[in-house]
Amino acid sequence: MILLDTHVVLWLKSDSARLSRKAKAAIEDARKEADGLAISGITLLELATLAKKGRIQLSISLESMLQEIEAQFIVLPISARACARTLQLPASYPEDPADRIIGASALVEGLALITADQEIRRSKVVPTIW
């Protein structure tokens, strides 16, 4: 199983060419597994917030989009372990609460994170694929 950052979910939904070859290959490999692709529960909130702010355009209702995503991926709950782990992340890791929950979730679940976020990748705190 691999964990997807929020922007990766958006890019997958839009068939974006922005995904790296390495990310595409990892996603294709993970899709072959029953427990292949996961997102954090906070990703659903991030997507809802982006829609509310008009930063993403929806062709269906927000609730329908979120339900589609929920059906497409394993949604990891925001666990107590992940919340506690956010406080142990070093200063080099992004301060954004969603980034911290996603990164901490990857760490406590032992998952690699697919992300284009340079700040996350540069921190080398979480194993990333890009």
Describe the role of every protein-language-model region:
Residues 8, 43, 82, 102, ...:
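Alpha-helix capping/helix-boundary segments
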Residues 50:
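ABC-type ATPase nucleotide-binding domain
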Residues 76-77, 128-130:
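Short acidic-hydrophobic, aromatic-tinged amphipathic segments that line or gate anion-handling sites
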Residues 1-39, 53-67, 109, 119, ...:
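Short, well-structured N-terminal submotif of metal-dependent ribonuclease cores
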Residues 59, 70-116:
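Active-site neighborhoods of divalent-metal-dependent phosphate/nucleic-acid chemistry enzymes
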Residues 87-89, 124, 129:
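Phosphate-binding/catalytic loops
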Residues 47:
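Phosphate/NTP-binding elements of NTP-utilizing enzymes
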